[in-house]
A protein has these predicted regions:
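A generic short-segment signal for beta-strand/edge and adjacent turn/coil regions
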Residues: 1, 17-21, 48, 90
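N-terminal Rossmann-like FAD-binding beta1-loop-alpha1 element of flavoenzymes
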Residues: 5-31
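Conserved N-terminal/central alpha/beta ligand/cofactor-binding core
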Residues: 37-120
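A short, basic/flexible loop-to-alpha-helix module at the beginning of a structural domain
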Residues: 1-4, 111
Length: 120
């Protein structure tokens, strides 16, 4: 069997889906997964998505992420992840993701290695 496609995305979690959504609409995209959609890390994650709540949160978010990664994380990548988190959440809301809310505002929780509530 021969499959013709413009782009192959390995992974069907949030990262793979977000990558596909950000490609030009005229591209033929093939997404592959090692088993089924419910086995992706995104589907199995205990909570949600981390987001920088405000600039005062940056240092503790950075430290929490580095500590969770046993300080083996690439610092530049952690910085990009944190600084782009608000824009990505905005994009996900525009795509229709319905995050939990409390009193009309996003409801942040504290989970895992995070020292402050920053999980949606």
């Amino acid at each position: 069997m021969e499959i013709k496609t413009d782009v192959v995305i390995v992974g069907t979690g949030v990262g793979g889906a977000f990558s596909a959504l950000n490609l030009p609409e005229d591209k033929q995209i093939l997404m592959i997964t090692k088993s089924d959609l419910e086995s992706s890390d995104s589907f199995l994650a205990q909570g949600g998505i981390c987001v920088l709540r405000d600039e005062k949160d940056y240092d503790s978010y950075f430290e929490d992420t580095m500590r969770a990664g046993h300080y083996e994380n690439r610092k530049e990548s952690v910085d990009i992840m944190i600084r782009s988190s608000q824009e990505i959440i905005h994009d996900l809301i525009e795509y229709g993701v319905d995050f939990a809310k409390k009193d009309g505002n996003l409801a942040f929780t504290r989970e895992g290695a995070h020292s402050r509530p920053r999980i949606l």
